[in-house]
C-alpha cells in the first residue's frame, strides 16, 4: 500500500509541476502579445494564480497584464498541449496497430540478410549453369520465378523447385501467383483452371512466345480460335501409355481418395479395365465413341476383349484380365464397372466427345508442342456427374510422360527450357495420381510443378493422407496465404516454423524503495496460428528449404511493366468470349 501511495504522490507532483509551468508560460505569452511587462516570478509562481485568478499581473509581477489576455493564453496553451498529447497517443496506437497487422518485422522471421543468402537473385544465378546448362549467361527470369519481395530484396524460386501454393478462395492465388508464373515461364506451359480468368490475361502474351492451344471439352471459353481436339486413345498401342492414361482416368473418379470402402481395390479394378479398353481401341483404330460405347456395360466391352484376344500386338494377358472382370460375379462386376462408367461419363456430353475425337488433320503432337515452347490451357469444371476432370488428368499424364522421354534424351537428362505445370484448382478439377512423384522428382528432369490448392485438408481429401503428406514434404517452396479456416493446418504451420525466446522484464521495489529488475525467458511461437490466418491480402508466408520463414510481399500482374499491354490483351480475349456467348445464346420464342 505504501508503494502505491508513493507512486500516486509522484504522479500528483508531476501534474502540479506541469500545471505550474503552463500557468507561468501563459503569463509570458500574454505579456508578449499585449505589450505588458514580462513576468519575473519563477515557474512555481504560476500556481499562485489559482488563488488570485482575477489578478494574474500581481501574482506574476507583470505590470499591465490583463486577466482576459492571460486566461486566453492559458486556454490556448492547454488546448495546444491537449492536441500534442492526443497526436502522440494516436501515433503510439497506430504503431502498435501496424506491428499487429504488418508481420514483416516479426521476430524470428527472415531478415534482409537471410533473404540475401537464401532466396535472392544472386543465389539463384550461382546455380544457373546447373539449372539451364544450354545458356552461357542466363538471367534470373530464365532460371527462376520471382515470387515477390521481402525487405527490399526479390524472393526467387528456381525452375527446379516444386512450388506448393495454399490459399482459400479469393485469396489472390491467380492474381499474385498463377498469372505471373505463366507469363514468366521460360519454356512450355501446361496450366489448368475451372475458369478462364488466367487464360484471358495470358493468352495473347503466350502466343507471342510459341503455339497456344486450349483444351476446353465443356466449352467454358467458347469462341477462341486456339481450340484443341485430343485423342483419348492416342499412343495407347504402347501398353505403358495405356497404363498411364488409365491411371489418370481412374484416379479422377475419387474411388481411391479414402471416402469409399475398399476404394483402392475398386480403383485398381477400374484402372485394369480402362487400360485394356484403351489398348484395344488404339490397336484396332477405334475412336472415343467406341470407348464410350464399351463403357456403358460389361457386355459391350466384349468387343474390346475380342480385339485383345486376336490382335498380335496386344499386351500379354490384358484380354484375359478384361474378360475376367466382365465374367466376374454380378456384384463384383457391377461395382468395378461403376468406376469405368464414372471415368468416362463425361463422354456422354456431345461437346466433350467431340473434343476427344480429332479428325485426320487435327492430331496433337506433344513433342512438337514442348519443343516449341507451347502453352496448353486445360479448362473444366470440378462439379457435376459429367465433369471433364478425368480427361484433364489423363491429358496431363500424357504430356508429362512425353516430357520425361524428351528429358531423358537431352543433355544432363534435363528438359531445357523447363516445362511449367501451373496446376490451378487441380484439387477441385482432377487430382493427378503422379503429383507426389512430380513434386519430388520433376525438378531434376526440367519439370517445374506448381499445384495451387485451397488447403492441406483439400489435399488429404483428394489424394489421401499419405499422398498429401508426400506432396507437402516434396514441395521445396511453400507459399501460404492468409485466410485459412483450418485450425489443424494453421497449428501445423506454426509448429513447423518453430519457436523463439521472449524476454519478460519485471520491476520489483524493495522495502526501502530500492528497485531491482528481473528478466525471465520463455519460448513462444514465431508465428502463432492466428498470425498466419491474419496475413493481409497480398502478403504470403514463404517456407524455402532450411531458411527462416520469409514474409513476402507478392506482386500482382497488374503491377508488371507490361500491365497495360496485358490489360489490352485481356479485353480482346474477353470480347471474343462475349461475342461467342451472344451467338450461342438461345433466342426466346416470340408470342404468336
Residue spans of the language-model regions?
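Low-complexity, polar-biased intrinsically disordered regions enriched in Pro/Ser/Thr/Gly
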Residues: 134-138, 254-265, 503-520
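Short alpha-helical interface patches
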Residues: 88, 95-135, 238-249, 293-297, ...
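Short alpha-helix boundary/capping motifs
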Residues: 12, 54-55, 89, 368, ...
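Basic- and hydrophobic-enriched, low-structure N-terminal and domain-boundary segments
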Residues: 1-171, 175-177, 510-511, 542, ...
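P-loop NTPase motor domains
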Residues: 18-31, 159-160, 164, 168-447, ...
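A broad, low-specificity signal for short, low-complexity segments enriched in glycine/proline
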Residues: 122-129, 145-155, 174-175, 336-339, ...
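Short gly/ser/thr-rich secondary-structure transition/capping motifs
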Residues: 144-151, 358-360, 461-462
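Conserved ATP-driven motor cores of ASCE-family P-loop NTPases powering translocation/secretion/packaging/pilus
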Residues: 439-541
Amino acid at each position: 500500500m505504501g508503494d502505491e501511495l508513493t507512486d500516486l504522490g509522484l504522479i500528483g507532483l508531476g501534474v502540479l509541476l506541469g500545471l505550474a509551468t503552463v500557468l507561468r508560460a501563459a503569463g509570458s505569452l500574454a505579456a508578449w502579445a499585449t505589450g505588458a511587462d514580462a513576468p519575473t516570478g519563477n515557474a512555481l509562481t504560476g500556481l499562485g494564480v489559482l488563488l488570485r485568478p482575477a489578478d494574474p499581473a500581481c501574482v506574476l509581477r507583470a505590470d499591465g497584464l490583463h486577466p482576459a489576455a492571460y486566461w486566453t493564453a492559458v486556454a490556448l496553451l492547454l488546448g495546444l498541449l491537449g492536441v500534442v498529447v492526443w497526436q502522440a497517443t494516436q501515433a503510439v496506437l497506430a504503431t502498435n496497430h501496424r506491428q499487429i497487422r504488418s508481420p514483416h518485422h516479426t521476430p524470428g522471421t527472415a531478415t534482409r540478410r537471410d533473404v540475401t543468402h537464401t532466396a535472392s537473385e544472386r543465389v539463384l544465378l550461382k546455380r544457373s549453369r546447373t539449372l539451364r546448362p544450354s545458356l552461357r549467361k542466363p538471367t534470373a527470369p530464365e532460371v527462376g520465378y520471382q515470387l515477390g519481395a521481402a525487405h527490399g530484396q526479390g524472393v526467387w524460386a528456381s525452375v527446379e523447385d516444386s512450388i506448393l501454393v495454399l490459399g482459400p478462395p479469393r485469396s489472390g492465388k491467380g492474381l499474385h501467383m498463377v498469372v505471373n508464373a505463366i507469363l514468366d515461364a521460360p519454356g512450355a506451359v501446361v496450366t489448368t483452371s475451372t475458369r478462364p480468368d488466367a487464360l484471358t490475361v495470358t493468352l495473347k502474351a503466350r502466343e507471342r512466345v510459341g503455339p497456344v492451344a486450349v483444351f476446353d471439352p465443356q466449352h467454358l471459353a467458347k469462341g477462341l480460335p486456339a481450340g484443341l481436339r485430343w485423342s483419348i486413345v492416342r499412343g495407347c498401342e504402347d501398353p505403358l501409355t495405356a497404363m498411364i492414361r488409365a491411371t489418370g482416368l481412374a484416379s479422377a473418379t475419387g474411388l481411391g481418395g479414402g471416402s469409399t470402402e475398399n476404394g483402392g481395390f475398386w480403383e485398381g479394378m477400374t484402372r485394369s479395365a480402362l487400360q485394356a479398353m484403351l489398348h484395344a481401341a488404339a490397336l484396332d483404330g477405334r475412336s472415343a465413341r467406341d470407348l464410350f460405347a464399351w463403357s456403358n456395360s460389361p457386355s459391350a466391352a466384349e468387343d474390346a476383349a475380342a480385339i485383345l484376344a486376336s490382335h498380335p500386338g496386344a499386351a500379354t494377358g490384358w484380354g484375359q484380365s478384361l474378360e475376367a472382370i466382365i465374367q466376374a460375379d454380378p456384384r463384383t462386376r457391377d461395382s468395378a464397372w461403376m468406376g469405368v462408367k464414372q471415368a468416362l461419363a463425361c463422354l456422354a456430353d456431345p461437346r466433350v466427345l467431340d473434343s476427344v475425337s480429332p479428325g485426320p488433320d487435327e492430331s496433337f503432337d506433344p513433342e512438337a508442342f514442348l519443343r516449341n515452347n507451347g502453352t496448353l490451357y486445360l479448362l473444366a469444371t470440378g462439379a457435376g456427374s459429367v465433369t471433364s476432370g478425368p480427361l484433364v488428368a489423363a491429358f496431363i499424364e500424357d504430356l508429362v510422360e512425353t516430357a520425361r522421354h524428351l528429358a531423358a534424351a537431352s543433355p544432363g537428362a534435363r528438359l531445357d527450357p523447363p516445362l511449367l505445370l501451373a496446376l490451378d484448382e487441380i484439387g477441385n478439377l482432377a487430382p493427378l495420381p503422379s503429383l507426389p512423384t512430380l513434386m519430388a522428382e520433376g525438378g531434376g528432369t526440367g519439370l517445374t510443378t506448381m499445384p495451387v490448392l485451397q488447403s492441406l485438408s483439400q489435399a488429404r481429401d483428394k489424394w489421401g493422407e499419405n499422398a498429401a503428406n508426400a506432396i507437402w514434404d516434396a514441395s521445396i517452396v511453400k507459399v501460404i496465404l492468409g485466410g485459412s479456416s483450418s485450425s489443424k493446418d494453421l497449428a501445423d504451420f506454426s509448429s513447423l516454423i518453430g519457436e523463439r525466446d521472449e524476454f519478460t522484464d519485471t520491476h520489483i521495489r524493495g522495502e526501502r524503495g530500492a528497485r531491482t529488475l528481473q528478466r525471465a525467458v520463455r519460448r513462444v511461437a514465431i508465428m502463432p496460428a492466428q498470425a498466419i490466418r491474419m496475413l493481409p491480402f497480398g502478403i504470403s508466408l514463404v517456407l524455402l528449404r532450411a531458411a527462416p520463414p520469409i514474409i513476402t510481399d507478392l506482386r500482382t500482374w497488374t503491377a508488371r511493366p507490361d500491365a497495360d499491354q496485358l490489360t489490352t490483351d485481356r479485353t480482346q480475349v474477353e470480347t471474343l468470349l462475349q461475342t461467342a456467348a451472344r451467338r450461342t445464346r438461345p433466342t426466346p420464342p416470340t408470342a404468336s
